[in-house]
Amino acid sequence: MFTLKKPLLVLLFLGTVSLSLCEQERAADDDEGEVIEEEVKRGFMDTAKQVAKNVAVTLIDKLRCKVTGGC
């Protein structure tokens, strides 16, 4: 029985180490996904702001044209 304890402990240790490494790698992958998602959201908001700004400028130009009467 004693001769089987050491190999079993070594296998248990190696399994624990490999499991720990897998969890760290998975956590690193999860962090990268959040960063990419945040960048996509930021890119969408910047695009929406730019479109709103362009629409506002166009409307102001048309309003100014109607008020002054000369275009």
UniProtKB/Swiss-Prot annotation:
Keywords noted in UniProt: Amphibian defense peptide, Antibiotic, Antimicrobial, Antioxidant, Cleavage on pair of basic residues, Cytolysis, Disulfide bond, Hemolysis, Secreted, Signal
UniProt-annotated location(s): Secreted
Domain of life: Eukaryota
A single GO cellular-component term on record: extracellular region
Residues of the propeptide: 23-40
Keyword flag DNA-binding: no
InterPro entries cross-referenced by the UniProt entry: Antimicrobial_frog_2, Frog_antimicrobial_propeptide
Disulfide bonds: C65-C71
A single MF term (Gene Ontology): antioxidant activity
Annotated GO biological process: defense response to Gram-negative bacterium; defense response to Gram-positive bacterium; hemolysis in another organism; killing of cells of another organism
Signal sequence interval, chain numbering: 1-22
Tissue specificity of this protein: Expressed by the skin glands.
Pfam families per UniProt: Antimicrobial_2, FSAP_sig_propep
Functional note: Displays broad-spectrum antibacterial activity against a range of Gram-positive and Gram-negative bacteria. Has low hemolytic activity, low cytotoxicity and low antioxidant activity.
Family from the record: Belongs to the frog skin active peptide (FSAP) family. Brevinin subfamily.
Name of the protein in its database record: Palustrin-2AJ2
